[in-house]
């Protein structure tokens, strides 16, 4: 039975979908003004894993991940580049899709762009004004009146008295209270024409928080199963989403028997780089595409899922090399077994049960991967039909996390992308020269070739019958 840690309740809860057998899930996606970094990769990989396991468990999943394609940062970058907003955002949406595809991730079922949902956002803002939870200030902005919603702070655990307005937002001329946040930003004279839309409150554009409320409610309904995102979005973004969505539906006082906006809130942990916060100023800011120049996409996914999704993780080349070594162990167990086919996962099987128990415990991928390592050791010990069956089970269980689906030799010979640069053909030439040296009984030369290849990250393994296999270290 699946249990999910719900940020809202601060506890693990048995997962009970609103409609039996069906799951509606919304994840906050990217703001597209630059290339995606490894923090974005973690969000993509974590919720890709969640969807895969839900589907493997028999659920029909509707997976929605939005794109923020209008935002202050987007406007600033477009002005710097002297290009239209749409040209900038389309370019980085294409780059995001390319990164996601190279990582081997599934596409969301729906990927709404904020600019396609302006009408829905305006409708929700109008409802909040009608419910006396929003107002238009003197500067033309429409703001949410935070203090009028008594339950504000339920997700973050912050009370209105605890909130420090100075830390959140500087009070503007149009706000009645420093805690209030903007729903609709009035257009400024210097802003481009493609950043403004007509509205009942004058020309302007939506605030960031209202975008996700409107898109999720339009596509999934006012009450759905799972909302996910990075831990940094818990407050204020997700807190504000709850305020807007429930405020529009129920007004100022949601009753106990009223359905909440979302049943389960999931948040993945931060990424640190060499034990420091990732930032451009520290020079430790890594783009997905740059990481993939040095490391195999499957290695990057394995690195991300070796840690529990809620835990912070430390990014370093050493950690990625460790992940590569771990995957190498698993793939090595599948070598020398003809035609390893996946097998149906029978939860009566003790290996499958251990794996499923781990995944059903709040998607505990570290424990699930530990089961894969134990199973790989058993594959190495087994013989005959049992070895074939266990290898198929290893491939099947790994496949639920999108691991171990390649030809083992292909993975083992791919190695790290920042190796010496020896091609497969060059390595085979060295192996042929070593075979010739051994046949000529020049064992010193043969050993020298082995050592030279090892220094360049290539491991040779002599097999019965005079066969030599190789893999990258």
Swiss-Prot record:
List the coiled-coil residues: none
EC number in record: 6.1.1.16
Chain ranges for the short sequence motif 'HIGH' region as given in the UniProt record: 30-40
Where does this protein chiefly localize? cytoplasm
Q: What class of enzyme is it?
A: ligase
Intracellular or extracellular location(s):
Cytoplasm
What the record says about family reads: Belongs to the class-I aminoacyl-tRNA synthetase family.
The protein's assembly and partners: Monomer.
What name goes with this protein?
Cysteine--tRNA ligase
Q: Identify the coding gene.
A: cysS
């Amino acid at each position: 039975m699946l249990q999910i840690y719900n940020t809202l309740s601060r506890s693990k809860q048995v997962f009970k979908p609103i409609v039996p057998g069906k799951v509606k899930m919304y994840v906050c996606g990217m703001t597209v003004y630059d290339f995606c970094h490894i923090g974005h990769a973690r969000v993509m990989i974590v919720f890709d894993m969640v969807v895969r396991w839900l589907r493997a468990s028999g659920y029909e999943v509707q997976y929605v991940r939005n794109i923020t394609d209008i935002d202050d940062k987007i406007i600033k970058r477009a002005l710097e580049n002297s290009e239209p907003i749409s040209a900038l955002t389309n370019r980085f949406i294409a780059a995001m899709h390319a990164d996601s595809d190279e990582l081997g991730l599934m596409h969301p079922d729906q990927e709404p762009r904020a600019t396609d949902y302006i009408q829905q956002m305006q409708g929700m803002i109008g409802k909040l004004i009608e419910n006396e939870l929003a107002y238009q200030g003197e500067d033309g902005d429409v703001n949410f009146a935070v203090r009028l919603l008594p339950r504000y702070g339920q997700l973050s655990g912050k009370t209105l008295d605890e909130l420090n307005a100075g830390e959140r937002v500087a009070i503007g001329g149009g706000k009645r209270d420093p805690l209030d946040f903007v729903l609709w930003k009035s257009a400024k004279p210097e802003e481009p024409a493609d950043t403004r839309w007509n509205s009942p409150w004058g020309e302007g554009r939506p605030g960031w928080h209202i975008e996700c409320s409107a898109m999720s409610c339009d596509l999934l309904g006012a009450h759905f199963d799972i909302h996910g995102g990075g831990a940094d979005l818990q407050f204020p973004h997700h807190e504000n989403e709850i305020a807007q969505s429930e405020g529009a539906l129920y007004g100022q006082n949601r009753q106990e028997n009223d359905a909440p906006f979302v049943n389960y809130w999931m948040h993945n942990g931060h990424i640190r780089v060499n034990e420091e916060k990732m930032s451009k100023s520290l020079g430790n800011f890594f783009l997905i595409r740059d990481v993939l120049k040095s490391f195999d996409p499957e290695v990057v996914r394995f690195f991300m899922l070796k840690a529990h999704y809620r835990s912070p993780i430390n990014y370093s080349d050493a950690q990625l090399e460790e992940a590569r070594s771990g995957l190498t162990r698993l793939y090595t167990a599948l070598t020398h077994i003809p035609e390893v086919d996946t097998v149906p996962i029978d939860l009566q099987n003790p290996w499958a049960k251990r794996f499923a128990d781990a995944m059903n415990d709040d998607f505990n991928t570290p424990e699930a991967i530990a089961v894969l390592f134990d199973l790989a050791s058993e594959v190495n010990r087994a013989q005959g039909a049992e070895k074939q069956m266990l290898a198929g089970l290893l491939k099947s269980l790994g496949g639920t996390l999108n691991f171990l689906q390649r030809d083992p030799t292909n993975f083992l010979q791919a190695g790290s992308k920042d190796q010496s640069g020896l091609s497969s053909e060059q390595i085979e030439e060295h192996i042929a020269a070593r075979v010739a040296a051994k046949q000529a009984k020049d064992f010193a030369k043969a050993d020298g070739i082995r050592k030279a290849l090892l220094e360049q990250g290539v491991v040779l393994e002599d097999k019965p019958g005079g066969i030599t296999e190789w893999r990258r270290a």
